[in-house]
């Protein structure tokens, strides 16, 4: 439902317009048929046929899509990014494999004052202005309502210019750490979606894709996924949890709205949840519902607490679920070992997962800012030792890639400057972005050759059977 058809500009709350968004993954003639039906719960019960609404239901037509012009950035010339049963996602057009280096933080990316209906419910987590990136907005870039959106659009420009190719965000964090992002008109109206806000999000997501930024939808977080409380998962009550943690009307509608409004984008994944604590049954049901509903078959992953991976992932491997990958959270010096573990476990189960390192411990530190950024030393303290961006580069970035992982997203901790909830200046980690670009460019330079996909972690060839950080080996024995 699109309200008046121009809600991003008008902030309209009502209207008669319905819109289908589509982005083709190949040029040529495309045919369409309209399905427009009504029935109680027809939007959430996929087996309901519904009653046709005349004269719209059944209308047919066609249109031509021309070959996209070559562009130095963006996904429009690559085709759709898909899971192909291998350890990396692959573009349908270019056949290029995708290795990511992205920003996991801030998880409150969408907590932006320029979006309609967006408020801060915690004094310590105010809305963002993205002021430091106003300088990065360029003439011709999108905005809405007489110049709104320039800060966030500029932030995306900056990331793309640094070689970053992925952003992560939580579109529903009601009751969570940020408690300032939701697609509905309010957290208490779980079945009433905000058309103008979502159209403004769409402008941002469209620009991200045009700049070559993969969209990582972390659809919920541990504080609002179910009624279990905190890391131990003690019994409690979370009013913001959709259907109390089950797959019911609220959650099904949430997935449908996300897929209907944003699923046409070429490069994204759906993440069942950050530090997810729902049961294996519900996790399987959620993944299956998304798989059935999403016409583009986007990549589906799940994120877990580091010390709960051995509990969460095994019941989801192979044909036990529709998941196609894991979004790992590990201590920065455990990325290699844990990436190897889940790639090998998924292979053994009969369905290779795409495994990425998307959050780095310790929780208070993560990836530290650059040395000299606003006087910062560059060193993060952890118990009896210190670490810096070079440790992240060696053991998180290269440790993941040399394990056969498909890339990283960097988490900014909660104590350091420009942290996970408060970050508004991506220049705080500029050197880490540059190191990431070097690594991704290295793998992209020969990833059209199928041999890169055939390579596996072979630490045994360099006498590292424990997969520690002493040395790494990615190889196809006898070839490379």
Question: Model-predicted segments: where are they?
Answer:
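Substrate-binding surface in catalytic domains of secreted glycosidases
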Residues: 330-346, 363-365
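Short beta-strand/loop segments at the ligand-binding rim of alpha/beta enzyme cores
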Residues: 293-301, 351-359, 364-367
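Aromatic- and carboxylate-lined catalytic core of secreted/periplasmic carbohydrate-active enzymes
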Residues: 354-355, 362-369, 380-382, 389-480
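Active-site mouth of glycoside hydrolases
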Residues: 39-41, 53, 60, 68, ...
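Generic beta-sheet signal
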Residues: 218, 303, 358, 410-411
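Glycine-enriched alpha-helix->loop->beta-strand junction motifs that scaffold or abut catalytic
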Residues: 296, 318-325, 349-354, 403-406
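Short, flexible/disordered intra-domain loops and linkers
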Residues: 184-185, 230-241, 368-389, 421-425
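Ligand-binding face of N-terminal immunoglobulin V-set domains in extracellular IgSF glycoproteins
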Residues: 1-65
